[in-house]
């Protein structure tokens, strides 16, 4: 009997670097060689004996290149003698061994497959069905099951119930292979009852079918369609997958981080599932980066999101049963870094329908209860997740067993033997363990390699890169050597919590294993342990990254296309609140088109010729209102993160325009902005040496349109996380400002907007936060792709040692000076994308890490402080976007050896990367002491870019000391809550001001026009507490999100405080934050008079003396200045502590438009490097715990 198989072009089989569901690693348990490939899957021949017990060295002979010269649709008859092979999750493939012509001449056709290694033995290889079912090709066509009871979302099949139909070999249609796979042709049309999809590309072959990339006709949507096989052995599991997806379709896929299913339909007797298109799975991402370890700050959001998905699955009684890096997808690395979703529910089942002795999960991530044949539940997913995060941390699988014996052997050697009660109950315990009979007490022991080989004929071979005697030793792997001070302490504390959580996730006893909800409450995830390091830039970066990943639907409304930046400030997802704008002149400005990739806000245009922001920014930044005298962008970032940034004139930020018509803006009009609980705020994009970039087509809009749209819709509210139920906009500008009408003004939203998705789902994370204040609006920001990165940003990333092949912060710091002097043409040369081929990873050197600590270094520390600047430098030439990123691990590290040139194949070739003569070679012993690790400085996630800012640590204080002087500035606290239900206390900063000259006509700070409670609090500030756990004022360039993934972190920008005279009116805040259930006494006043400031104390400049480079920016205690309101930023500590970093600003550096600069005398002599221009600093936009707040 012959099958009709379509021959289709080679593009269908292109190796996928980004796919919804990439080709899966095969679960192979062969004889003779235990190594398998992941990129080039090993194939286990089922039911055939080729007399070859070793990997075939001629596997490539099966990769026949077919010149596709025949018209589409021509078929060829293939002999029935096909080779049946099995993939990882049980899917079968048919290799055409011989081809015959069928009516037309055609070249010999051999269906493309990955490199094959034929091995004998009828091993089931963890498959969910038996091989005998494969060969049951007799019988009539039959309907296996009907799935008529489905939600409306999935009942879209041409009016008929979903049927899984199978056909015999002799009667199957010519579009279906012998194993039930649908044979696709490019541009084939798949029709559901509602939509039509055109096949664009082949994405991957999975457990129960294949996945293709399709275009939804009539729209601009790209979807992924999973076409299930119609083989009878897959019918039941396909039905289960459809039913599970139907159940999940009623949940919020964005909130719970699993892939969204759109519809289900039938196409030629194949069930087709339509999913949202995702970008890249974690395994492909690791592979692109040569399996470099990821930093904990990047692992944490992945863990948090997957644990959230498992929490939901557990609540529904579902088991995913195939969690692995291949099934965790990056949603959109460009616009949503760190956002992941769980895919592939083809192996999922309900917990009540589990059967013991069932093979589930991929072997590397298979739980002990599955290996031993014990009853199992959702806890197997937690084991898999533990193995996944360990692999992300190590860059290599923790337990890469090629055989189940190897898998349980690795587990037992590191974590000890399973409990006797487990071995007694396990149905498969005797396969790997044997009872001791010559002992006084009966017990179990692991079979030796020789015993197992004698029984099974399979020879084990070491596949681990790291051999741990205990999971505690993981803490010493890939130690970051470039951190110091608070950053180093924070990293060590983070590692301890990570290992603590990992041990709980990898408990052999499933009953004791940590649950998803407990995981989410673990200190490693909620970062409570990092609150003890408020000045650490590592901590700030950790909080910042977690803020990003907690916005699941942030980009849905803008992820399809970038729109013109000149648009109404009011966004669709915001509440329709009217803004009190009267007597506001029109604005004349020019729209920056999308081709310029500007990062200004939607409603904040730039002039033509000033679009220097040709930088691929993963999220959109906004600008402050810059007085005409202030120009430039920062040229260096090596300053303490809590203070103002200096500005150079090298690259103008806002150019002046001739005054045509003054624009009168009422005081406080632009001040009613919301604080983002999601991300850090910013005022100016702080790229260094931005290449000038004019807009492609800048159009001059009419005054009426620009003015009415921008200002008329200003002030609407953005929904945020349900951590807060109120929005507290602080005053931004509290005095009148006169601007020229044609001059482009960059208004300081200082806010990254995370709107709700367009589709209405229940239980959103981003719920509307009620606001009883004046009607305000914050517009969406344009999503900018980081694939176009400014020269300055590239230079920050490009400080890479060619030998080390990874970016360290020390290098970035060294290159900072030189990068300022380079012209933009040099920067442009460094913006070429580097495509990294699937090069193998380093030699698989087995490193035994014992818990016995020695205090000796195993290798000298190479120099990390300079960049060669040559064209050979990988990172210097790359934009390092997240989906095409250089590998930045060191070749000379004994632990991070994953990118050396002579390396062995990476885990994609995972256990069988070494030849037989290489086995057991390269073993090294690394002591378990922290000092013995020699690869920390080579770790690809060394974040020394924040080392310069690590010298701000001061002692934490408690509220005490009634003798403090009145503050020299004002501060208001915006909310930055992390955990719901946390009590919040506050520690005010102790100020050391010795004299407070008052400006004429203004009251003394903290004394006049102050409520009694506030005045008392002002007179009794706490001890010096100028620290914070996470300063959202310090804003990182989002375009460097890919650097975070690869362990290279760009500098963070800071926000500017705008000093202005205060004209304020009282208003009432409706505060519903769980962190702030009570109003503090110092903020409880309700009798603020208009025009009078609410003052909170600032720390003295002495307490910030460690920040010498910005001493000129600190508040001068003896200098006259206007009374400012500087909102400060705080972190809600679980124990009820709020850490603040109020910042004093020398008004000389930022003159108010209504106050002349000569009225201020800086206490410090001017420095040559700041004399270029005035500077402005950043500030958060929303206070916290306020019942009355003056504005306007």
Curated annotation (Swiss-Prot):
It holds the Pfam family Pkinase. Residues 889-906 have a biased composition (Low complexity). Its EC number is 2.7.11.1. Keywords: Apoptosis, ATP-binding, Cytoplasm, Isopeptide bond, Kinase, Nucleotide-binding, Nucleus, Phosphoprotein, Serine/threonine-protein kinase, Transcription, Transcription regulation, Transferase, Ubl conjugation. It is found in: Cytoplasm; Nucleus. GO terms for molecular function: ATP binding; protein kinase activity; protein serine kinase activity; protein serine/threonine kinase activity; transcription corepressor activity. The active site is at 322 (proton acceptor). Residues 843-895 are annotated as: SUMO interaction motifs (SIM). The keyword Mitochondrion does not apply. Heart, skeletal muscle, spleen, testis and lung. Its main location: cytoplasm. Gene3D superfamilies: Phosphorylase Kinase, domain 1 (3.30.200.20), Transferase(Phosphotransferase) domain 1 (1.10.510.10). Residues 847-857 are annotated as: Interaction with UBL1. The keyword Calcium does not apply. It catalyses: L-seryl-[protein] + ATP = O-phospho-L-seryl-[protein] + ADP + H(+); L-threonyl-[protein] + ATP = O-phospho-L-threonyl-[protein] + ADP + H(+). There is a cross-link at residues 27, 1185 (Glycyl lysine isopeptide (Lys-Gly) (interchain with G-Cter in SUMO)). InterPro entries: Kinase-like_dom_sf, Prot_kinase_dom, Protein_kinase_ATP_BS, Ser/Thr_kinase_AS, Ser_Thr_dual-spec_kinase. One of its GO terms (biological process) is peptidyl-threonine phosphorylation. Autophosphorylated, but autophosphorylation is not required for catalytic activity. May be sumoylated. Interacts with UBL1/SUMO-1. Interacts with and stabilizes ligand-bound androgen receptor (AR). Interacts with Nkx1-2. Interacts with FAS and DAXX. Probably part of a complex consisting of HIPK3, FAS and FADD. Binds to NR5A1/SF1, SPEN/MINT and RUNX2. Serine/threonine-protein kinase involved in transcription regulation, apoptosis and steroidogenic gene expression. Phosphorylates JUN and RUNX2. Seems to negatively regulate apoptosis by promoting FADD phosphorylation. Enhances androgen receptor-mediated transcription. May act as a transcriptional corepressor for NK homeodomain transcription factors. The phosphorylation of NR5A1 activates SF1 leading to increased steroidogenic gene expression upon cAMP signaling pathway stimulation. This is Homeodomain-interacting protein kinase 3. It comes from Mus musculus (Mouse). The lineage of its organism: Eukaryota, Metazoa, Chordata, Craniata, Vertebrata.
């Amino acid at each position: 009997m012959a099958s009709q198989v379509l021959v289709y072009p080679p593009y269908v089989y292109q190796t996928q670097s980004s796919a919804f569901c990439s080709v899966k690693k095969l679960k192979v348990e062969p004889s003779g060689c235990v190594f398998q490939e992941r990129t080039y899957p090993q194939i286990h021949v089922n039911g055939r004996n080729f007399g070859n017990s070793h990997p075939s060295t001629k596997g490539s002979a099966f990769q026949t290149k077919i010149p596709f010269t025949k018209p589409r649709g021509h078929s060829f008859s293939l002999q029935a003698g096909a080779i049946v092979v099995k993939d990882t999750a049980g899917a079968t493939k048919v290799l055409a061994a011989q081809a015959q012509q069928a009516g037309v001449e055609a070249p010999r056709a051999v269906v493309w497959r990955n490199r094959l290694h034929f091995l004998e033995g009828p091993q089931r290889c963890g498959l969910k069905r038996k091989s005998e079912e494969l060969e049951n090709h007799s019988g009539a066509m039959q309907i296996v099951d009907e799935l008529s009871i489905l939600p409306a979302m999935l009942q879209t099949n041409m009016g008929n119930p979903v049927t899984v139909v199978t056909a015999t070999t002799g009667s199957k249609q010519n579009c279906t292979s012998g194993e039930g796979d649908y044979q696709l042709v490019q541009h084939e049309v798949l029709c559901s009852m509602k939509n039509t999809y055109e096949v664009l590309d082949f994405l991957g072959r999975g457990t129960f079918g294949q996945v293709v990339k399709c275009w939804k006709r009539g729209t601009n949507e790209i979807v992924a369609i999973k076409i299930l096989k119609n083989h009878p052995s897959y019918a039941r599991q396909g039905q289960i997958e459809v039913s599970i997806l139907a159940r999940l379709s009623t949940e919020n896929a964005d909130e719970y981080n699993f892939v969204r299913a759109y519809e289900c339909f039938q196409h030629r007797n194949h069930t087709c599932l339509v999913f949202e298109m995702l970008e890249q799975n974690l395994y492909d991402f690791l592979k692109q980066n040569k399996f470099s370890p990821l930093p904990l700050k990047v692992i944490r959001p992945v863990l948090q999101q997957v644990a959230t998905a498992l929490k939901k699955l557990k609540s529904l009684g579902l088991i995913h049963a195939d969690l692995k890096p291949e099934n965790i997808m990056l949603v959109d690395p460009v616009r949503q870094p760190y956002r992941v979703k769980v895919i592939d529910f083809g192996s999922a089942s309900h917990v009540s329908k589990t059967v013991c002795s069932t093979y589930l999960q991929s072997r590397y991530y298979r739980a002990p209860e599955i290996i031993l044949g014990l009853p199992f539940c959702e806890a197997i997913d937690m084991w898999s997740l533990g193995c996944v995060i360990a692999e992300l941390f190590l860059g290599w699988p923790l337990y890469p067993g090629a055989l189940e014996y190897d898998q349980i052997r690795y587990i037992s050697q590191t974590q000890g033997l399973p409990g006797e009660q487990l071995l007694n109950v396990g149905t498969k315990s005797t396969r790997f363990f044997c009872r001791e009979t010559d002992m006084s007490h009966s017990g179990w022991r692991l079979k030796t390699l020789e015993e197992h080989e004698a029984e099974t004929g399979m020879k084990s071979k070491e596949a681990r890169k790291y051999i741990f005697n205990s999971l505690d030793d993981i803490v010493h792997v890939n130690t970051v050597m470039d951190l110091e001070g608070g950053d180093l302490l924070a990293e060590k504390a983070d590692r301890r919590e990570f290992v603590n959580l990992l041990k709980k996730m990898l408990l052999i006893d499933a009953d004791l294993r940590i649950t998803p909800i407990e995981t989410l409450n673990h200190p490693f995830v909620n970062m409570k342990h990092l609150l003890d390091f408020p000045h650490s830039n590592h901590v700030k970066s950790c909080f910042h990254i977690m803020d990003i990943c907690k916005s699941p639907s942030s980009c849905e409304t803008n992820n399809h296309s970038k729109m013109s930046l000149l648009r109404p400030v009011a966004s669709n997802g915001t509440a329709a609140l009217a803004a009190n704008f009267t007597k506001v002149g029109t604005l004349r400005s020019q729209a920056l088109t999308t081709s310029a990739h500007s990062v200004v806000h939607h409603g904040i245009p730039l002039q033509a010729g000033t679009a220097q922001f040709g930088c691929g920014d993963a999220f959109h930044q906004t600008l402050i209102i810059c007085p005409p005298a202030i120009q430039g962008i920062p040229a260096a970032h090596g300053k303490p993160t809590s203070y103002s940034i200096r500005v150079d004139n090298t690259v103008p930020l806002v150019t002046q325009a001739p005054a045509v018509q003054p624009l009168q803006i009422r005081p406080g009009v632009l001040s009613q902005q919301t604080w983002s609980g999601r991300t850090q705020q910013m005022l100016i994009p702080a790229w260094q040496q931005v290449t000038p970039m004019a807009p492609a087509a800048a159009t001059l809009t009419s005054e009426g349109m620009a003015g009415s749209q921008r200002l008329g819709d200003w002030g609407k509210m953005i929904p945020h996380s349900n951590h807060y139920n109120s929005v507290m906009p602080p005053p931004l500008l509290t005095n009148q400002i006169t601007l020229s009408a044609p001059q482009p003004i960059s208004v300081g939203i200082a806010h990254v907007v995370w709107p709700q998705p367009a589709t209405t789902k229940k239980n959103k994370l981003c719920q509307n936060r009620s606001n009883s204040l004046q009607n305000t609006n914050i517009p969406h920001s344009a999503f900018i792709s980081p694939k176009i990165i400014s020269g300055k940003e590239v230079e920050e990333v490009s400080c890479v040692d060619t030998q080390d092949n990874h970016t360290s912060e020390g290098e970035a710091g060294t290159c900072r000076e030189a990068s300022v002097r380079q012209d933009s043409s040099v920067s442009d040369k460094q913006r070429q994308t580097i495509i990294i081929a699937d090069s193998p990873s380093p030699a698989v050197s087995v490193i035994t890490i014992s818990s016995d600590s020695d205090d000796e270094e195993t290798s000298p520390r190479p120099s990390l402080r300079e960049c060669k600047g040559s064209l050979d430098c990988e990172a210097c030439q790359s934009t390092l976007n997240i989906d095409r990123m250089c590998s930045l691990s060191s070749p000379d590290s004994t632990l991070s050896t994953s990118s050396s040139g002579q390396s062995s194949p990476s885990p994609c070739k995972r256990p069988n990367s070494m030849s037989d003569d290489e086995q057991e070679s390269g073993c090294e012993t690394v002591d378990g002491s922290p000092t013995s690790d020699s690869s920390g400085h080579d770790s690809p996630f060394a974040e020394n870019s924040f080392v310069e800012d690590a010298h701000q640590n001061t002692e934490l204080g408690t509220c005490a000391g009634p003798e403090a002087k009145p503050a020299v500035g004002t501060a208001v606290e915006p909310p930055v809550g992390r955990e719901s239900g946390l009590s919040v206390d506050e520690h005010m900063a102790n100020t050391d001001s010795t004299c407070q000259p008052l400006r004429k006509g203004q009251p003394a700070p903290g004394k006049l026009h102050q409520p009694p409670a506030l005045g008392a609090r002002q007179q009794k500030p706490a001890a010096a507490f100028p620290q914070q756990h996470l300063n959202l004022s310090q804003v990182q360039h989002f375009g460097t999100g890919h650097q975070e993934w690869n362990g290279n972190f760009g500098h963070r920008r800071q926000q500017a405080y705008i000093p202005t005279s205060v004209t304020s009116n009282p208003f009432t805040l409706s505060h519903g934050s769980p962190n702030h259930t009570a109003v503090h006494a110092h903020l409880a006043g309700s009798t603020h008079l208009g025009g009078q400031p609410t003052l909170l104390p600032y720390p003295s400049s002495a307490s910030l003396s460690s920040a010498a480079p910005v001493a000129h920016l600190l508040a001068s205690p003896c200098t006259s200045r206007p009374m400012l309101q500087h909102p400060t930023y705080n972190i809600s500590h679980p124990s009820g502590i709020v850490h603040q970093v109020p910042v004093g600003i020398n008004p000389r550096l930022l003159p108010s438009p209504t106050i002349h600069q000569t009225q201020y005398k800086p206490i410090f002599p001017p420095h040559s490097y700041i004399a270029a221009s005035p500077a402005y600093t950043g500030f958060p936009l929303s206070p916290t715990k306020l019942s009355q707040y003056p504005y306007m």
